[in-house]
């Protein structure tokens, strides 16, 4: 498969996916290395494709029938799961987390969390990586972009 057709196949797969697609899954489906996919994604982005990287893989923005809003939140690390569960239990998808850093300015982490399973996976990644959520940089103060049904 030539590079141009492979990149088109990547875009097609991302357009039809209902979940983030990992570079490894794309590589296996296209019979190339993960590194080739990462390079293709970079070239697609440079060409204007709005591909976002989440902790679970790549996504394209979707047109939604719902409402997209940004909310401000403040909580402790221990309350992170409770916050996310409340949001997804009410039908919201948590698209990202945003903090205002005094040196770097606005930092955004892509989340794409829409179910309790996604919440569990996110919390497990935090525990397993021994990394702190972005909100801990600002004493728990952060923003979330939500997509909610009408």
Question: Which functions belong to the PLM regions below?
Answer:
Residues 66-150:
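Mid-protein regulatory/catalytic core that forms ligand/cofactor-binding pockets
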Residues 1-29:
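Extreme N-terminal segment that seeds HTH/winged-HTH DNA-binding domains in transcriptional regulators
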Residues 51-62:
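Minor-groove-contacting beta-hairpin "wing" of winged helix-turn-helix DNA-binding domains
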Residues 35:
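Key DNA-contact positions within bacterial/archaeal DNA-binding proteins
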Residues 41-42:
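Short, hydrophobic-biased segments on the C-terminal half of alpha helices
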